[in-house]
């Protein structure tokens, strides 16, 4: 069974998914509707504004016609490493043979590396960045340089 692991992003005031969170979630809904994945795991804990990232994704997925039975929630994680680590029991419960990590293209290589180092068979699928705010996209891309170095350091054991 292929399961999409949707990595979290910010929730804005009033529980509104940020553009990044919305883009990832809608992309995952498309994978489910297209039959490319059989279940979805929304990952992400509580940031600055409620609800948790995972709950904001669940609400958006439901509004896009994904049934609640196809959605699992990992609502405690605070970063990419925790997203994947804390989703592993949910993947096992679902009998997942492969995780399809749904995140932005700039983030996908690090997320795949973490997943593989944690023993998951993982690929990634990224939404289009068309219409994204260019300065934000550039900042996210540049952030991946130190974030990847930190991930390698954390996973060295």
Labelled PLM ranges:
Residues 134-157:
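A transmembrane-helix-recognition feature enriched in membrane-embedded lipid enzymes
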Residues 1-141:
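A structural signal for short, hydrophobic/glycine-enriched beta-strand patches
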């Amino acid at each position: 069974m292929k399961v999409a692991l949707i990595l979290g992003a910010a929730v804005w005031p009033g529980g509104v998914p940020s553009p990044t969170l919305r883009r990832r979630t809608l992309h995952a809904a498309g994978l489910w509707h297209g039959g490319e994945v059989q279940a979805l795991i929304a990952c992400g804990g509580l940031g600055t504004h409620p609800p948790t990232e995972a709950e904001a994704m669940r609400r958006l997925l439901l509004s896009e016609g994904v049934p609640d039975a196809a959605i699992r929630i990992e609502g405690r994680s605070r970063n990419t490493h925790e997203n994947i680590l804390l989703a592993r029991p949910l993947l096992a419960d679902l009998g997942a043979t492969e995780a399809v990590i749904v995140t932005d293209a700039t983030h996908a290589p690090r997320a795949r590396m973490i997943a593989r180092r944690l023993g998951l068979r993982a690929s990634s699928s990224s939404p289009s960045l068309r219409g994204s705010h260019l300065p934000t996209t550039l900042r996210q891309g540049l952030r991946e340089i130190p974030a990847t170095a930190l991930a390698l350091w954390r996973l060295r054991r």
